[in-house]
């Protein structure tokens, strides 16, 4: 006997609010922070999110009878209070894995953060976390190389890597840009980088920049005996142009390229990561535009989700903020998504903002990149917070040295090695930071000048997006 079709409109909670449901290991789980309009029950708001991000529409439709809605629908299985926020609540939603294309971060985000964010019944909506099931993770390529392969390629072990962004980031000719790269690398840095908005502008076309940078890297390697690299930004107007730039970097023998993964898009990023894996090139990822999406504490997507998605899409290094510098991010939250980048298993821990256990299986890890308003006085805290599997990037903290970029690079290298040596000797480097740096400065005039130059520079602003604990 055929099922009866009842036309009309019914409440979302009649279908999508399922508090007795026990999530499956193969389900993709999501936690949303919801703020509904006044008078709309929480269960209805949560169910509406589950419906619109999976199989639902505003009206009952006859074509539901042509499929198994009970199998395919998203299910809101739990609602929790948000500590300290009477307006909002957490909605936990389970999605069957068959709703998503294998290996496609793009498809997952299109479903979970698509039309639902424009619902009139919602004042605010924020995607706080996703639990990706192993069955989905195994279909994703992930980082093209990973932490260990990058260390082997660059022959650098036992410490954080050291880098800087070339400044001024816009306006230099290709030749002068290459000169600054050389000064930084010969001074002691492992990497230099293009900033996010250097592509191919009238003052500096990309081919010209790539050629002068390659010459600078080669010369610095010959002089120092160390492997060096520069993140050549391949982000472009079209995928074809992006791959053309990547191929040219490979022809020049460069070890690493760069992509702006949010402005460039996950489709482009996944494709470039696959190219890097095939061609043996490292991939640095910049998160330009992330704060538009993740900074509001009640609306958007938390950066931990964007970090997880990047690990799945592919990248060997990702910017994560600094905790101590000029960019947003408190310590526990930052450590939470650094764990998601580097660890093979991350347990649920609300004190770090992780709402679910996340098993990454054998997927390689991603270097966490600390960049933005940092200088030598921050070095002990950065080493303590980020650990060895990180890249510490000092832009103004290198080029702003009174003696020039090479001296700034030398100061940072001496400070880093002093902190690593003190840590390995069992000293509490954050508590003893001043003594450690001043001791090292006795043998490094570059560091002594840097410490004097930046002794009064602090970024003491309260964090906007705090953990709900």
From Swiss-Prot:
A cellular component annotation (GO) from this entry: plastid
Location of the protein in the cell: Plastid, Organellar chromatophore
Cofactor(s) needed by this chain: Mg(2+)
Keywords for this protein: Calvin cycle, Carbon dioxide fixation, Lyase, Magnesium, Metal-binding, Monooxygenase, Organellar chromatophore, Oxidoreductase, Plastid
PROSITE patterns associated with the record: RUBISCO_LARGE
Binding annotation for substrate: 115, 165, 169, 287, 319, 371
GO terms assigned for molecular function: magnesium ion binding; monooxygenase activity; ribulose-bisphosphate carboxylase activity
Modified residues (N6-carboxylysine): 193
Cofactor: how and how many bound: Binds 1 Mg(2+) ion per subunit.
Binding site for Mg(2+): 193, 195-196
The EC number(s) this enzyme carries: 4.1.1.39
UniProt keyword Translocase present: no
Cleavable signal peptide: none
Catalytic activity annotation: 2 (2R)-3-phosphoglycerate + 2 H(+) = D-ribulose 1,5-bisphosphate + CO2 + H2O; D-ribulose 1,5-bisphosphate + O2 = 2-phosphoglycolate + (2R)-3-phosphoglycerate + 2 H(+)
Cited PANTHER family: RIBULOSE BISPHOSPHATE CARBOXYLASE, RIBULOSE BISPHOSPHATE CARBOXYLASE LARGE CHAIN
Anything else known: The basic functional RuBisCO is composed of a large chain homodimer in a 'head-to-tail' conformation. In form I RuBisCO this homodimer is arranged in a barrel-like tetramer with the small subunits forming a tetrameric 'cap' on each end of the 'barrel'.
Protein name: Ribulose bisphosphate carboxylase large chain
Taxonomic source organism: Paulinella chromatophora
Higher taxonomy: Eukaryota, Sar, Rhizaria, Cercozoa, Imbricatea
């Amino acid at each position: 006997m055929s099922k009866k079709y009842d036309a009309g409109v019914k409440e979302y909670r009649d279908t999508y609010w399922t508090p007795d449901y026990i999530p499956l290991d193969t389900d993709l789980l999501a936690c949303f922070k919801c703020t509904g309009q006044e008078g709309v029950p929480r269960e209805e708001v949560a169910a509406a999110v589950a419906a619109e991000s999976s199989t639902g529409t505003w009206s009952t439709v006859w074509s539901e009878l042509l499929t198994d809605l009970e199998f395919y629908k998203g299910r809101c299985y739990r609602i929790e209070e948000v500590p300290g926020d009477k307006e909002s609540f957490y909605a936990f939603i389970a999605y069957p894995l068959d709703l998503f294309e294998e290996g496609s971060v793009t498809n997952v985000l299109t479903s979970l953060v698509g039309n639902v964010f424009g619902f009139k019944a919602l004042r605010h909506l924020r995607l706080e976390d996703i639990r990706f099931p192993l069955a989905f993770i195994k279909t994703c390529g992930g980082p093209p190389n990973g932490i260990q392969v990058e260390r082997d390629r660059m022959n650098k072990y036992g410490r954080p890597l050291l880098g800087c962004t070339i400044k001024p980031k816009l306006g230099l000719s290709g030749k002068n840009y290459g000169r600054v790269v050389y000064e930084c690398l010969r001074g002691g840095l492992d990497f230099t980088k293009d900033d996010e908005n250097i592509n191919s502008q009238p003052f500096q076309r990309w081919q010209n920049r790539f050629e002068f940078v390659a010459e600078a890297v080669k010369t610095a390697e010959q002089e120092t005996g160390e492997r060096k690299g520069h993140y050549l930004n391949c982000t472009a107007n079209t995928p074809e142009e992006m791959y053309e730039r990547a191929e040219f970097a490979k022809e020049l023998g460069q070890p690493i390229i760069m992509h702006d993964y949010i402005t460039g898009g996950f489709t482009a990023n996944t494709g470039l990561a696959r190219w890097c894996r095939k061609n043996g090139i490292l991939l640095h990822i910049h998160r330009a535009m992330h704060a538009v999406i993740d900074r509001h504490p009640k609306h958007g997507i938390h950066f931990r989700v964007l970090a997880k998605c990047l690990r799945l899409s592919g990248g060997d290094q990702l910017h994560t903020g600094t905790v101590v510098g000029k960019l947003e991010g408190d310590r526990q939250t930052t450590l939470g998504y650094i764990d998601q980048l580097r660890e093979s298993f991350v347990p649920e821990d609300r004190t770090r903002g992780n709402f679910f256990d996340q098993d990454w299986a054998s997927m390689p890890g991603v270097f966490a990149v600390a960049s933005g308003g940092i200088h030598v006085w921050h070095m002990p805290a950065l080493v303590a917070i980020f650990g060895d599997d990180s890249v510490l990037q000092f832009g103004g903290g290198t080029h702003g040295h009174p003696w020039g970029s090479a001296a700034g690079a030398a100061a940072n290298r001496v400070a880093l090695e002093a902190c690593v040596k003190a840590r390995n000797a069992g000293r509490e480097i954050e508590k003893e930071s001043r003594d450690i740096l001043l001791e090292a400065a006795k043998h490094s005039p570059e560091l002594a000048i840097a410490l004097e130059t930046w002794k009064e520079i602090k970024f003491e602003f309260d964090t906007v997006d705090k953990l709900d604990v």
